[in-house]
C-alpha cells in the first residue's frame, strides 16, 4: 500500500515539474516577480530584521530577485545549507551572493564558513 502511494506521489511530482518546465521563461519570471511583490507587502516581512529564503533551481519560482532585495535593504539574509554527515540543515547568514557554492546536489547554498544563525534570530521565512 505504501509503495502505491509513494509511486503515485512520484508520478504526480514528475508531471507537475514537467508542466512547470514547459512554461515559457518570460512567464515564469513574471510570475516569480508577482510572488515576491506580494511577499514583501506582508507587514511582518517588512518589519523583519532577518529573512530566510532558499536559492531556487531550474524552473522553480526564482528567488534570486528576493535574495537581492533582502540584501539591498540591509536586512539579514539566511539561506539553508545541508550538513549531510550530521543529516541536518542549518540556516547560514549570507551577505553577498559570492558566498554561495554548489552542493553535491547542484544547489547553490552558503559556504561552510558562513555563520550559522540560531533559528530564533529568523523573523520571516
Tell me the role of every PLM-derived stretch.
Residues 2-123:
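N-terminal active-site beta-alpha-beta segment that forms phosphate/nucleotide-binding
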